[in-house]
Amino acid sequence: MKRTYQPSKLKRAKTHGFLARMATASGRKVLKLRRKKQRAQLTVSSER
């Protein structure tokens, strides 16, 4: 059985990136809550 986590920067950004979060209402809610908690990183996009 192969391991389930096969890292890919592109897939990670497309799924969890800033634009992906902004695209849906629930994603915007995620950003809002992360801003409220003053997270250093809002999304994985800021890893670059």
Swiss-Prot record:
InterPro entries: Ribosomal_bL34, Ribosomal_bL34_CS. HAMAP family: Ribosomal_bL34. It comes from Mycoplasma pneumoniae (strain ATCC 29342 / M129 / Subtype 1). Keywords: Ribonucleoprotein, Ribosomal protein. One of its GO terms (cellular component) is ribosome. It holds the Pfam family Ribosomal_L34. Belongs to the bacterial ribosomal protein bL34 family. GO terms for biological process: translation. One of its GO terms (molecular function) is structural constituent of ribosome. This is Large ribosomal subunit protein bL34.
